[in-house]
A protein has these predicted regions:
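PLP-dependent amino-acid enzyme catalytic core
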Residues: 1-494
Length: 494
């Protein structure tokens, strides 16, 4: 039976996986979400010897079950190749107190590569399956990493165009240069005078603008998304949690069947939601620990049941988590409410009109899987230094947040279940922050910090950063948040 994906806001809006990938966001504003848990035969005594590609095929064939075996082989083979600097794709590294699942070995040295390497192939395959020959325009808001990874994936892919919005003062220098130097005739990067939530809100609005949709269709063009609201982004992230567990079994760190905890640095909630789905298909998970920075709206939600975005937006050293409207939480809310679209829509409408909602009648078994905490800027820096002092291993600030939250969780609960931290970016993406945390000194410049980091860590400078300082800046457009649609229409000539 084909797995059904339904909008979180309309029980009558049901589609297949390929239809969900092609649409990106449901026309009613909801997110396409699997109505049931697919059956996956997870035999870790066998999977421990499987390649990343083999695990991907097992997981994706269950979630994307309207794709043929040949179609999935094509997507997986083209996605997980020598774009990654290790054959393991996502290696697990043992540190003194926890394990790091390194998700930054792709072409843009951030975890977004794990899904955005395959999304272009899933999307173009979905278009063929649905008989769609419109130009597909990827419209995306980024808090730093998604934009570059999406452009790297879609650059010069026939039949596609990609437009990325990012907050002008809300990303690191390295992140900004990675985006503004991106090549590819079909890539467009636009800075906005505003924050990530401003960008994401208007991208969602454009997706739901019926007049704009009709205007685009008249030009044989349609939107899709590279954000984690697209299931084509979300489902591939489930793979690496399955793979991580298999690697722990293979290394003898755990026995097959032992529970593990996953600690995930969290902004838009997609990465930790993928860990939840991994648990649902059979990965033995004890706790899912949701780690936030000082934008701790999720910590408060799990503590109180109230989601309240009415608070100051803080710019931190972990910019990919500087988010107050956590889009993918909507999918968890939908599950917590027994897949009730009407109730979910009511809460999401309240978030828009009142700036908050309170969850009532939630599935306690699901809620109890989660723990949540946040780390301040000082706590994050101190944790990066502690991890370095104990392991001679340098974490990026997002991983540092997760590590600090995990340490606090252990202090509070005395839960010493083996724990994997999703290490979401290379420290080379945030070199000044990493060097400052470890040495107490500011390198004064991102590229000086890259050299300092190389000297301190002995880790080779990744190709994604090497040469970036002198690369040509190709994208220089800055617009007001209110003018995002005008910019899109201008680029697309509609």
């Amino acid at each position: 039976m084909t797995l059904v994906y339904q909008s979180t806001r309309d029980e009558n809006n049901k589609v297949t996986a390929s239809q969900a990938i092609l649409q990106g966001l449901a026309t009613d504003g909801g997110l396409f979400t699997p109505l049931s848990t697919p059956e996956v035969a997870l035999d870790f005594d066998q999977l421990k010897d499987a390649s990343y590609q083999e695990v991907a095929k097992l997981v994706l064939s269950a979630f994307l079950d309207d794709f043929t075996e040949e179609e999935l082989d094509y997507c997986i083979t083209n996605a997980y190749d020598d774009k990654f600097d290790t054959a393991a794709i996502a290696p697990v590294v043992k540190l003194k107190n926890h394990y790091n699942l390194e998700l930054f070995h792709g072409s843009t040295i951030a975890f977004k590569d794990m899904a955005l390497s395959i999304l272009p192939y899933l999307l173009t395959t979905s278009a063929k399956k649905q008989g769609v020959d419109n130009k597909i325009v990827i419209l995306t808001a980024t808090s730093g990493d998604t934009g570059k990874a999406a452009m790297a994936g879609f650059a010069d892919v026939p039949g596609t165009e990609i437009i990325v919005f990012y907050p002008k003062d809300g990303v690191s220098k390295i992140q900004e240069l990675q985006m503004t130097t991106q090549t590819g005739a079909n890539t467009h990067v636009i800075a906005i005078d505003g924050n990530f939530d401003d960008a994401q809100t208007d991208v969602k609005r454009m997706f739901n603008d019926v007049d704009l949709r009709e205007k685009l269709l008249a030009h044989h063009t349609q939107f899709s998304s590279a954000n984690s609201m697209n299931v084509g982004r979300l489902v591939p992230q489930v793979v690496y949690y399955v793979y991580a567990y298999a690697q722990l079994v293979k290394a003898g760190h755990i026995q097959n069947g032992d529970k593990v905890n996953f600690t995930v640095p969290t902004g838009n909630f997609g990465n930790i939601l993928a860990a939840y789905y991994a648990r649902q298909i059979g990965v033995p998970v004890g706790k899912l620990i949701c780690a936030s920075n000082e934008n701790n709206v999720l910590t408060d939600f799990f503590a109180t049941g109230t989601y309240d975005k009415k608070r100051d937006f803080k710019v931190t050293t972990s910019p990919s988590m500087d988010i107050l409207v956590s889009s993918n939480l909507e999918r968890l809310i939908f599950h917590l409410l027994g897949n009730d679209a009407a109730k979910t829509k009511e809460l999401m409408d309240a978030l828009v009109t009142k700036g908050e909602y309170t969850l009532a009648g939630a599935d306690k078994d699901i809620l109890d899987l989660f723990a949540a905490g946040f780390a301040t800027e000082d706590e994050t820096a101190a944790e990066i230094k502690r991890v370095y002092d104990e392991n001679k291993y340098i974490e990026d600030p997002h991983t540092g947040v997760a590590s600090a939250v995990y340490e606090a969780y252990v202090q509070k609960t005395d839960d010493h279940t083996p724990t994997v931290i999703a290490s979401t970016a290379s420290p080379y993406k945030f070199p000044r922050v990493a060097i400052s945390a470890v040495t107490g000194k500011d390198s004064g410049d991102d590229f000086k910090a890259v050299e300092d980091l190389h000297q301190l860590s002995g880790v080779a400078i990744p190709a994604a950063v090497d040469g970036l300082e002198h690369a040509e800046v190709r994208h220089k457009t800055v617009v007001a948040a209110a003018d995002m649609q005008k910019a899109v229409e201008s680029y697309l000539g509609v």
